[in-house]
């Protein structure tokens, strides 16, 4: 089972943090929680819909986008092929590519938005359900 204040979906645990961190600070924060946590990867439309429902429960009437575990690490303006937790990008919902990715507050957290990695936003950590 997931820790008591985390939410579960499929075989993963999630938590939205109301802390304002840059993308790198947020990823570091997730990895320091428990071994194996990262900024959330989104690997299906079902997972995207789950997170779109989860975020507003924590960030009530939020004016902020929410970091997810994807960023462009190349010189060319192309998306990285892997999430920070190492899983392959098999599902994409994005309009244009630049640097770091978040869930778009103006689209009900269903669409991705590219943001400067130095912006400070809330974020979602994700890991496998502990066995």
Curated annotation (Swiss-Prot):
<feature type="disulfide bond">
    <location>
        <begin position="100"/>
        <end position="117"/>
    </location>
</feature>
<dbReference type="GO" id="GO:0005576">
    <property type="term" value="C:extracellular region"/>
</dbReference>
<dbReference type="InterPro" id="IPR050111">
    <property type="entry name" value="C-type_lectin/snaclec_domain"/>
</dbReference>
<keyword id="KW-1199">Hemostasis impairing toxin</keyword>
<dbReference type="InterPro" id="IPR016187">
    <property type="entry name" value="CTDL_fold"/>
</dbReference>
<keyword id="KW-1015">Disulfide bond</keyword>
<keyword id="KW-0964">Secreted</keyword>
<feature type="disulfide bond">
    <location>
        <begin position="30"/>
        <end position="125"/>
    </location>
</feature>
<dbReference type="Pfam" id="PF00059">
    <property type="entry name" value="Lectin_C"/>
</dbReference>
<dbReference type="GO" id="GO:0090729">
    <property type="term" value="F:toxin activity"/>
</dbReference>
<comment type="subunit">
    <text>Heterodimer of subunits alpha and beta; disulfide-linked.</text>
</comment>
<protein>
    <recommendedName>
        <fullName>Snaclec macrovipecetin subunit alpha</fullName>
    </recommendedName>
</protein>
<feature type="disulfide bond">
    <location>
        <begin position="2"/>
        <end position="13"/>
    </location>
</feature>
<keyword id="KW-0800">Toxin</keyword>
<dbReference type="InterPro" id="IPR016186">
    <property type="entry name" value="C-type_lectin-like/link_sf"/>
</dbReference>
<feature type="domain" description="C-type lectin">
    <location>
        <begin position="9"/>
        <end position="126"/>
    </location>
</feature>
<dbReference type="InterPro" id="IPR001304">
    <property type="entry name" value="C-type_lectin-like"/>
</dbReference>
<comment type="function">
    <text>Interferes with one step of hemostasis (modulation of platelet aggregation, or coagulation cascade, for example).</text>
</comment>
<comment type="similarity">
    <text>Belongs to the snaclec family.</text>
</comment>
